Regions:
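C-terminal "cap" of GNAT-fold acetyltransferases
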Residues: 153-182
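Local sequence-structure signature of Cys/Sec-based thiol-disulfide redox active-site neighborhoods
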Residues: 172-207
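Conserved acetyl-CoA-binding loop-helix of GNAT-fold acetyltransferases
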Residues: 91, 97-114
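Conserved GNAT acetyl-CoA-binding A-motif
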Residues: 113-137
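Non-catalytic, surface beta->alpha helical segment in thiol-disulfide oxidoreductase systems
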Residues: 238-262
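Conserved beta-strand in the GNAT
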Residues: 52-54, 60-71, 85
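Short amphipathic alpha-helix that is part of the acyltransferase structural core
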Residues: 1-57, 190-193, 197-203
Length: 262
């Protein structure tokens, strides 16, 4: 068994999708999400250098880590200079879990963060922050990050590298008058699942209320639209929705309550 970690470049870019979308490579909706992410990865490569690392198990791409400077994302409110945002670590292959692929990816990022990252112009970063979530595959990211030495803070986890952790000031949500009697769902090109998920959200909202107007907004291309809504993933009738789509009963109830608000 041999594990190799490689930085993303134009030659291995498609391996990102062989990891993250390996079950949906021919799905038309997923391919649209892949197209958006492919363009974003190339844009980031050109402007910053590699923001993804891939783990290969005996030559096969099996896991990836996505990271980027926090101030490179236009819709992030009050970004912290010199801070690396760890978006995700993903290993979808059961036969490749428990072999250290994810750990090697994180260790590689930590090592370069202290010595100098290409996407920071060769400078070390101050600290790494992460927003863990649970894909339902393998161990939850929060648990994995804790095992790797990350600490918990309000709304994120962090690992100090060359400086002490500082929380980010976040804008509180302010209802937007133009969002009355309609829904706004945000998506971005950072993950190829984001756009397909936004389409699922729109479909679910139309099932709940066929008369509801639903607009999908690309946060990357329209950062101010995302910022003024506090980057909430879904707004219905000027009300942020907190229930997750997969919790159908809670989601439907919260959406209906928001629609009925005067």
């Amino acid at each position: 068994m041999y594990i190799e970690v490689r930085d993303l470049d134009e030659d291995n870019l498609e391996d990102v999708f062989r990891v993250c979308s390996h079950r949906k490579l021919e799905d038309p909706t997923q391919r649209k999400g892949m197209e958006l992410k492919r363009g974003w990865l190339l844009e980031m490569l050109d402007r910053y250098g590699p923001t993804t690392k891939l783990a290969y198990l005996d030559g096969k791409p099996v896991a990836q880590i996505l990271f980027y400077p926090e101030d490179s994302i236009p819709y992030v409110e009050n970004p912290r200079e010199g801070v690396m945002l760890l978006n995700c670590v993903y290993n979808p292959f059961p036969e490749a879990r428990g072999k250290g692929c994810g750990k090697l990816l994180v260790k590689s990022l930590i090592h370069e963060s202290s010595r100098g990252l290409g996407c920071l112009g060769g400078r070390p970063c101050r600290f790494i922050v992460a927003n863990p979530f649970n894909t339902g595959e393998g161990i939850p990211l929060e648990q994995f990050y804790s095992h790797m030495g990350f600490k918990k803070a309000q709304g994120e986890m962090y690992m100090e590298i060359t400086a002490s952790y500082q929380p980010r000031c976040r804008r509180p949500y302010t209802p937007q008058p133009e969002d009355r009697d309609r829904a706004i769902a945000l998506y971005n090109p950072l993950c190829e699942y984001s756009y397909p998920f936004a389409l699922r959200v729109k479909e679910s909202l139309n099932q709940i209320d066929p008369s509801l107007t639903v607009e999908l907004i690309d946060s990357w291309r329209n950062p101010q639209e995302a910022k003024k809504r506090g980057n909430h993933w879904l707004i219905v009738n000027s009300t942020p929705i907190t229930s997750f789509l997969l919790d159908r009963e809670a989601f439907s109830q919260e959406v209906l309550e928001a629609i009925r608000k005067k």
